[in-house]
Amino acid sequence: ALLESYAGQEDDTDSSEKKEELPNIIVVMNESFSDLNVLGDFTTNEDYMPYLHSLQNGAENTVTGYLNVSVCGGNTANTEFEFLTGNSMAFLPQGSIPYQQYITKELPALPAYLASLGYETVATHPYYADGWDRDKVYPLLGFSESIFKDQYWGAGYVRKYVSDNSCVDKIIELYEKKEEGTPLFVFNVTMQNHGGYSDTYDNFTPDITVEGVESTPLSQYLSLVRLSDQALEKLISYFEETDEKTIVVFFGDHQPNDTVAAPILNLNGMTTKTLTEDQLKLRYEVPYVIWANYDIDAESGKDTSANYLAADVLHYAGISEN
């Protein structure tokens, strides 16, 4: 795995001096976040992710592209596994869930490596601790603290899940209470956009519609994505104003289920059951953003895979990769 070479490296510089050079690394893996435009053209009454689209159009100190993931419509934990360990699901049996089957002891991973450099490493997920065995797995990957739903006091909800806006509030809270001079690594897995998308709710009214399509799930999904886009803008806007060097990474774990995607495919002469191999690959693409509040080489259209993304993050963070 790419990250194995990072494990156990000796840091021969003065630790306090080194810590100050290291940027905070804030990672948001956003539940079901994707840009369905990769599947084909469609027209909405308003842009469903205007902020992310603006970042893709050549924003300063920003790297954007599409991430190839190994899951579609579910199995979030596998994208987590690929990002955090640098391992690929391609080398594991079909149907595997590494969190539940293979991680039984400490293994080389991004949080463990960052912890060895002096980072405070925090995983946060506003749902139940035992989901995908995260409460057991996170410490084995090197997280010093794990925060779950029971610690999201006073959080706002969208439908029946903690909102992305409240996830951003939690990240800001973690940053503001951290030890000064100690770099912070936060890995946030959101819940707001979790399927299904057919029920109605008193606390959420979908407002994005697709021309020529009547689909409650699609409208609800795109409206949720719009809220995620607003939360991303809030997160980056906050760190634009902070003094400490900080890098923000944002990506989706997978596309939504076929119920959401089918109308877009149908508009473009496809169905979920008749996709060619190349068309099916499009169902495994999600957008990603790497943004920094300091100078990095901006790049758009830089496509990669979930298991390579952490190495890119370390590169832009100025952390040795060999």
Question: Across the structure, where does each feature detected by a protein language model lie?
Answer:
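Solvent-exposed soluble domains appended to multi-pass membrane proteins
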Residues: S5-P23, V27-N30, S34-N322
